[in-house]
Amino acid sequence: MSNVHLVDHPLVQHKLTLMRRKDASTNSFRRLLNEISMLMAYEVTRDMPMQDIEVETPLETMQAKVIDGKKLVLVSILRAGTGILDGMLTVVPGARVGHIGLYRDPKTLTAVEYYFKMPGEMENRDVIVVDPMLATGNSAVAAVERLKELNPKSIKFVCLLTCPEGLATMQKAHPDVPVYTAAIDRELNSHGYILPGLGDAGDRIFGTK
């Protein structure tokens, strides 16, 4: 699929396999997600704009590169997006943070918004939306649609797992938004869960049921 980037680095795939195991503890699951998120941050930010500035080293003055423009914004889809957000902030500590609160209606599987908070000057910022699972795609589509109302410079979507159904939904609604994922699993089940998947990411991150 166009505009879909599979992050197949061996370290990412190894850690993802460990996360999939049903006997992985909450602590292990959370730690592994943090580590994968740091590795994925490297991939998703590789085309960020740069500018030259003058830097004085201990030996001489030189021209060196820094990231150009307003601070990047990482947008977490609550609640599970927090798991990816923490790892990415380790790599990009200067990023601004936004939150979108969405829950999935268990009957219709549609996304319902209950919270929305973003930094200022969004029209001058690049945005990375994070959520561990791109399953039905409804939450991702709703989040991106809401963000587009603020006219950011660009939007990317990062997830741990997705499936053909979720990707199709996302690409139909937002073909201009690149999706970065560690795996494309087989399918959705009738309850909207990815198969073979890794279960409910939010429950496994926070130790809830």
Swiss-Prot record:
Entries under CDD domains matching the protein: PRTases_typeI
GO biological process, one term: uracil salvage
Covalent S-S links between cysteines: none
Pathway linked to the protein: Pyrimidine metabolism; UMP biosynthesis via salvage pathway; UMP from uracil: step 1/1
MF terms (GO), sorted A to Z: GTP binding; magnesium ion binding; uracil phosphoribosyltransferase activity
InterPro entries xref list: PRibTrfase_dom, PRTase-like, Upp_B, UPRTase/APRTase, Ura_phspho_trans
Stored Pfam families: UPRTase
EC top class, as a word: transferase
Alphabetic keyword roster: Allosteric enzyme, Glycosyltransferase, GTP-binding, Magnesium, Nucleotide-binding, Transferase
Cofactor, free-text remark: Binds 1 Mg(2+) ion per subunit. The magnesium is bound as Mg-PRPP.
Binding locations of uracil: I194, G199, D200, A201
Residue positions binding 5-phospho-alpha-D-ribose 1-diphosphate: R79, R104, D131, P132, M133, L134, A135, T136, G137, N138, S139, D200
Regulation: Allosterically activated by GTP.
Catalysed reaction, written as an equation: UMP + diphosphate = 5-phospho-alpha-D-ribose 1-diphosphate + uracil
EC number: 2.4.2.9
Names of required cofactors: Mg(2+)
Job of this protein: Catalyzes the conversion of uracil and 5-phospho-alpha-D-ribose 1-diphosphate (PRPP) to UMP and diphosphate.
Cited NCBIfam families: PRK00129.1, upp
Cited PANTHER family: ADENINE PHOSPHORIBOSYLTRANSFERASE, URACIL PHOSPHORIBOSYLTRANSFERASE, CHLOROPLASTIC
Protein family per UniProt: Belongs to the UPRTase family.
Protein's recorded name: Uracil phosphoribosyltransferase
